[in-house]
């Protein structure tokens, strides 16, 4: 429960920070890079290099999307990036069914799910308020 509450706070702080630094054009897209990287980091902390590689392979779509949408102006990018955040939240909930990563703290999946849900939901809301739902115009 505390992981969900802290996750909600971190999600809101992420949105507020992006707005304060006027980073909505790039922050959410580049944030996609961190999602698989954290799981890989947990694996490395546990001394499981092969698991870290697997985490990054599974996370390649997030890395590619993050890089593309951070630097390229694309219509509906707020929607696509928001969906990627929401999909990662769902992945957090089922992650242990795909990969055994002993380095992942027990509190992390629900924490990350809530952060991802807050950020993804905000991006879908934002998509209706910026021209062409283009993050580069936010």
Which residues does each predicted region cover?
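N-terminal signal-anchor/start-transfer transmembrane helix
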Residues: 6-22
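Hydrophobic cores of alpha-helical transmembrane segments in multi-pass inner/ER membrane proteins
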Residues: 8-12, 64-72, 114-125
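Structural signature of hydrophobic alpha-helical transmembrane segments
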Residues: 1-9, 51-60, 110
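Membrane-interface helix caps and helix-loop-helix hairpins in membrane proteins
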Residues: 20-25, 44-53, 75, 98-106
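Membrane-interface capping segments at transmembrane-helix boundaries
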Residues: 19-24, 125-138
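Loop-to-transmembrane alpha-helix initiation sites
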Residues: 103-115
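Small-residue-rich segments of transmembrane alpha-helices in multi-pass membrane proteins
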Residues: 32-44, 66, 89-95
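Cytoplasmic-side transmembrane-helix entry/capping segments in multi-pass membrane proteins
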Residues: 25-34, 55-59, 79-87
